[in-house]
């Protein structure tokens, strides 16, 4: 047996132990463990624990001197603190957050949040690889450029759908020329922002070659990112434009960022217009159709319309010139090329619901509150009509049953 206090450990003044204590004490405290040693005390004839951290020992000594009882700390005083002080603060904070959420105007961050939530059910696997890119500044500038372009594109569609007279007036020509010039400038501005994303500026972790650091291209990562990216852009534009023109937005986004060979919305539209005639083609007709399509090598080197605005081939240049001459039966005048870099300093116009007060929209879906109320009232009206129809049908059935019963009795 040992006399006094028998220590079964290394002496306290050992320098390596102090270094170890300083490095790992915080980790062990988080796990609920302490560094120390067990020793035998002859006075109490029991094992006792001594901690290596002096700060803890000082605190314990202070507590022993004051004779603090833990039962008192868990009594009614703590209950009064939690019940009367902390709970009202949480309720007040929730109310203030709701009020702050209703204040201000709708921003692009609000639309991104709603779009991400709406896509989680259907496109969860693709969108998960895109969530880390949500707060990138290059993404915000690209989305604003896309919305800026789509606003003029939808304006052009509305002008084309208007009934046109045989003699187009001078005012209509000026309006069409103005919209087409703005649309062309917006497409060039969008192309610059899109090229930054393709080159991986500010997003090396999403680039297929890690911006030149990797020697092998990760095509799977590139495909997943851009597929989720196109879906996300379509959803954002649909929400911004009050959940209208979904088909037009899908087709235009597919046309901008895909070639004709890989444009899925265009193929769907062509199949709907043809009415399934391609399935009933003869072999000669099928060969003629396939002869018009480019070879695989050419299809791999083809550029999307957005990229071809900045880096067009000779054939694409000639095709774009021929398309721009005549729009809606009107010959457009050639105009001088503008410096697109000046668009950076120009304040973007308010597009769709962006910039409008938040209190006019549902914070979870960004739907206008008026449309939701109209939908509820229309639902109520439809339910009333259904009830009336059922009651009328019941009375008619009752009358018919009585008539048949009267006719069945003998006279």
UniProtKB/Swiss-Prot annotation:
How does it associate, per the subunit comment?
Interacts with PPP1CA.
What does the function comment of this entry state? Inhibits phosphatase activity of protein phosphatase 1 (PP1) complexes.
- Can you say what this protein is called? Protein phosphatase 1 regulatory subunit 36
Pfam families, alphabetically? PPPI_inhib
Does the keyword Transit peptide feature in the UniProt annotation? no
Which InterPro entries does its entry note? Pro_pase_1_reg_su_36 (IPR026142)
Keywords associated with the record: Protein phosphatase inhibitor
For this UniProt entry, the molecular function terms from Gene Ontology, in alphabetical order, are:
phosphatase binding; protein phosphatase inhibitor activity
């Amino acid at each position: 047996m040992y006399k006094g206090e028998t220590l079964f450990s290394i002496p306290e003044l050992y320098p390596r132990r102090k270094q170890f204590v300083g490095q790992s004490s915080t980790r062990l405290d988080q796990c609920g463990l302490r560094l120390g040693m067990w020793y035998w005390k002859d006075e109490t004839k029991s094992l006792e624990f001594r901690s290596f951290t002096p700060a803890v020992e000082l605190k314990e000594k202070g507590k022993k001197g004051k004779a603090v009882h833990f039962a008192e700390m868990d009594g009614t005083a703590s209950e009064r603190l939690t019940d009367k002080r902390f709970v009202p603060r949480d309720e007040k904070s929730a109310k203030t957050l709701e009020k702050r959420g209703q204040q201000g105007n709708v921003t692009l961050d609000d639309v991104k949040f709603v779009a991400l939530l709406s896509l989680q059910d259907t496109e969860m696997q693709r969108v998960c690889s895109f969530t880390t890119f949500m707060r990138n500044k290059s993404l915000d500038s690209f989305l604003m450029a896309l919305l800026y372009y789509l606003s003029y594109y939808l304006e052009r569609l509305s002008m084309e759908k208007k009934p046109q007279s045989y003699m187009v007036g001078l005012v209509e020509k000026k309006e069409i020329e103005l919209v087409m010039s703005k649309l062309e400038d917006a497409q060039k501005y969008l192309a610059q922002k899109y090229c930054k994303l393709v080159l991986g500026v500010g997003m090396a972790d999403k680039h297929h070659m890690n911006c030149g650091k990797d020697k092998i291209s990760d095509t799977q990562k590139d495909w997943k990112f851009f597929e989720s990216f196109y879906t996300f852009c379509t959803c954002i534009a649909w929400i911004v434009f009050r959940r209208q023109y979904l088909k037009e937005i899908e087709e235009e986004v597919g046309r901008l960022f895909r070639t004709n060979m890989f444009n899925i919305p265009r193929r769907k539209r062509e199949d709907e217009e043809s009415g399934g005639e391609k399935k009933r083609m003869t072999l000669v007709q099928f060969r003629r159709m396939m002869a018009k399509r480019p070879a695989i090598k050419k299809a791999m080197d083809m550029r999307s319309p957005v990229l071809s605005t900045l880096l067009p081939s000779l054939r694409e240049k000639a095709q774009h010139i021929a398309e721009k001459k005549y729009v809606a039966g009107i010959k457009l005048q050639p105009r001088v090329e503008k410096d697109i870099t000046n668009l950076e300093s120009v304040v973007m116009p308010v597009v769709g619901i962006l910039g409008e007060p938040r209190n006019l929209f549902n914070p979870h879906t960004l739907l206008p509150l008026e449309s939701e109320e109209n939908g509820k009232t229309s639902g109520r009206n439809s339910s009333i009509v259904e009830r009336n129809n059922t009651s009328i049908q019941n009375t008619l059935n009752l009358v018919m049953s009585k008539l048949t019963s009267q006719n069945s009795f003998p006279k």
